[in-house]
Structures are given as structure tokens and as C-alpha cells.
């Protein structure tokens, strides 16, 4: 054997693979950077969606904890509002029955029909009033959500009336 057998010579095949693997690595790094940026942007969006974290610096763990608390709070609030809606529907049905009992048939003398008080408000006005009330109470209720255990007086009255 000669001394030339121990020398490794770079072939054209080896040199052509090196740039490909560098390109592949660079492409992978770019994709990974894009993925990390997307996760970072998503956490920023989540942070900005939680009222108690808006504009604050917070770790990802804090963002997830506060977001979880806020979601639970909103679910409780949504459930309470749904109960209020159901109570109001029941009260509305009772009032409609009382109106039917007190006015069994429309006047036949050609006089205009009496309007139900509930029909006087347009649905858009009712929604606007509900939205204004809920948005003004949202921030104050969210900050004191842990102490929110007592049922509102209006619902207590409705529940007692329905019994």
C-alpha cells in the first residue's frame, strides 16, 4: 500500500451535498423562527384580550393562568345572564297571560288595538340598553368576580314571584 491510500480527497459528490444540507438547515431554521414568531404573536394577542393583563408584561405561564381565570369568569357571567334571560322570558309569559286574561278579546268597535307595553320598545333599543348596562358593569364585576356570590335582587324577586 502507498502513502496516498490514507489521504481523504473530497470528491465532487461530497461538495455538492454540503451546500444542500446548509440550505436545508437554513430553511428549517427559517421555518422554526416563523413558528416561534407565530406563537409569540398569539401570546401577545391572548394577553391583550384579557382585561387584567392589557398593556402589561407577563410571562407565558401568567398569560395562560389569567386567560383561564377570565374564561371561567366569563362562563359564570354568561350562565348568570342566561338565567336572567330565562327568568325574564318566564316573567314575560306570565305578564302576557295576565294581559290575555284582563283583555280576552280585541275591541270590535273599530278602535285601535291596545299595544302591549313590551311591544313599545323596539328590539334595537332593548339590545342597546342591555349592551350599555352589561358593558358598564363588566369591568367592575370582573375586578370583583371572586366575591360575586350573591344573586341580584331582580332575580331574587323574580324567583319569589314565580314560586
From Swiss-Prot:
It is found in: Nucleus. SUPFAM superfamilies: HLH, helix-loop-helix DNA-binding domain (SSF47459). Residues 23-74 form the bHLH domain. Residues 29-40 have a biased composition (Basic and acidic residues). Residues 134-146 have a biased composition (Low complexity). Residues 1-13 have a biased composition (Acidic residues). All four alternatively spliced forms are present during development and in all adult tissues examined. It comes from the Eukaryota. GO terms for biological process: positive regulation of transcription by RNA polymerase II. Phosphorylated. One of its GO terms (molecular function) is DNA binding. Residues 1-40, 98-117, 128-163 are annotated as: Disordered. GO terms for cellular component: MLL1 complex; nucleus; RNA polymerase II transcription regulator complex. Its main location: nucleus. Keywords: Activator, DNA-binding, Nucleus, Phosphoprotein, Repressor, Transcription, Transcription regulation. It holds the Pfam family HLH. Efficient DNA binding requires dimerization with another bHLH protein. MYC/MAX heterodimers bind to target DNA with high affinity. MAX may also form homodimers which recognize the same target sequence, but which are unable to function as transcription activators. Component of some MLL1/MLL complex. PANTHER family: PROTEIN MAX, PROTEIN MAX MYC-ASSOCIATED FACTOR X. Transcription regulator. Forms a sequence-specific DNA-binding protein complex with MYC or MAD which recognizes the core sequence 5'-CAC[GA]TG-3'. The MYC-MAX complex is a transcriptional activator, whereas the MAD-MAX complex is a repressor. This is Protein max. It comes from Xenopus laevis (African clawed frog). The gene is max.
Amino acid at each position: 500500500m502507498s502513502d496516498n491510500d490514507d489521504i481523504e480527497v473530497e470528491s465532487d459528490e461530497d461538495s455538492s451535498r454540503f451546500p444542500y444540507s446548509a440550505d436545508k438547515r437554513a430553511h428549517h431554521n427559517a421555518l422554526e423562527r416563523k413558528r416561534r414568531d407565530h406563537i409569540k404573536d398569539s401570546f401577545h394577542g391572548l394577553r391583550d384580550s384579557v382585561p387584567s393583563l392589557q398593556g402589561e408584561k407577563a410571562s407565558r405561564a401568567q398569560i395562560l393562568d389569567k386567560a383561564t381565570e377570565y374564561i371561567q369568569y366569563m362562563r359564570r357571567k354568561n350562565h348568570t345572564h342566561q338565567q336572567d334571560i330565562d327568568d325574564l322570558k318566564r316573567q314575560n309569559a306570565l305578564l302576557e297571560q295576565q294581559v290575555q286574561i284582563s283583555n280576552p278579546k280585541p275591541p270590535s268597535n273599530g278602535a285601535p288595538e291596545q299595544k302591549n307595553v313590551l311591544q313599545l320598545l323596539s328590539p334595537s333599543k332593548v339590545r342597546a340598553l342591555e349592551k350599555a348596562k352589561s358593558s358598564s358593569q363588566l369591568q367592575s364585576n370582573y375586578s370583583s368576580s371572586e366575591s360575586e356570590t350573591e344573586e341580584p335582587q331582580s332575580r331574587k324577586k323574580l324567583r319569589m314571584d314565580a314560586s
